[in-house]
Regions:
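A short hydrophobic/aromatic micro-motif that marks alpha-helical segments and, especially, helix-coil
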Residues: 17, 45-47, 60, 175
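Alpha-helix initiation/capping motif
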Residues: 42-45, 59, 130, 161
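Short loop/turn motifs at secondary-structure junctions and domain boundaries
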Residues: 58-63, 146
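Acyl-donor (CoA/ACP) binding surface of acyl/acetyltransferases
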Residues: 1-33, 37, 67-183
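Conserved GNAT-fold acetyl-CoA-binding loop/helix
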Residues: 33-55, 66-68
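Terminal output helix/cap of sensory domains in signal transduction proteins
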Residues: 55-58, 114
Length: 183
C-alpha cells in the first residue's frame, strides 16, 4: 500500500496510529467493554500497545491491514480498520474509547473507511463480525447497510471459550441504507 492515507470527516481525523498514541491506546484498552468485545489482549499491557503501533505501521507498508486512529479535538477517540484485506474483500473492525461513545463517532469514522474501501481500494465486499450481544457495534454496521448473514456458532475466539458471533456483509453494490436485523 505504501504511504498511510489520512481520512477526514466533519469532526474527526483518521490517521495511522503512531508511537505518541501508545499511552492513550494502553489507557483506553483497559476498558472492560473493549476487552470483552474485541480481540485485544486481556489483560492489556503497555507492551501490547507498543506492539500494536509497530504492527499497524507494518500492515500499512504491506497493505494487508489498514488501521486508523480515530482522533477528535481532544485526542485519541478509538480505532477503525480494514483487516485481512485479500481477494477484493476485508473485515471492518472498530472500537471507541468510553469517553467518545454516544457522539456518533463510530458511524462517522466507519462511513469514511467504507467509502475508502469501496472507492480508492476498489474492494467488492466487507464483512463485519461481532460477539453476539454487542448491540452497539451491531447498530453501527446495520446503519451502514450491512446485511446480517447469520450467527457463527462458537465462531469467535476470545479470552476464554469460543463464543457465538454475528456475521454481516456489505457489497460495493449494496444500498448504503439501514437494514432490518432481527437482533
Amino acid at each position: 500500500m505504501g504511504e498511510p492515507v489520512v481520512l477526514r470527516t466533519t469532526r474527526l481525523t483518521l490517521s495511522r496510529p503512531v508511537d505518541s498514541d501508545v499511552d492513550a491506546i494502553f489507557d483506553e484498552c483497559q476498558d472492560p467493554v473493549i476487552q470483552s468485545f474485541t480481540t485485544v489482549p486481556s489483560p492489556y499491557a503497555r507492551e501490547d500497545a507498543e506492539k500494536f503501533v509497530a504492527l499497524a505501521s507494518h500492515w500499512w507498508d504491506e497493505g494487508s491491514e489498514l488501521v486508523w486512529a480515530i482522533r477528535d479535538a481532544a485526542g485519541l477517540a478509538g480505532m477503525v480498520g480494514l483487516h485481512r484485506i485479500k481477494d477484493g474483500a476485508a473485515e471492518l473492525g472498530y472500537w471507541l474509547a468510553p469517553g467518545a461513545r454516544g457522539r456518533g463517532y463510530a458511524a462517522e469514522a466507519t462511513t469514511a473507511v467504507v467509502d475508502f474501501a469501496f472507492g480508492p481500494l476498489r474492494l467488492e465486499r466487507l464483512e463485519w463480525h461481532a460477539v453476539v450481544g454487542n448491540t452497539a457495534s451491531a447498530r453501527v454496521a446495520q446503519n451502514l447497510g450491512f446485511q446480517l448473514e447469520g450467527i457463527r456458532r462458537r465462531g469467535l475466539a476470545g479470552h476464554g471459550p469460543r463464543v457465538d458471533g454475528w456475521i454481516a456483509g456489505l457489497l460495493a453494490t449494496d444500498p448504503r441504507t439501514p437494514q432490518p436485523w432481527p437482533v
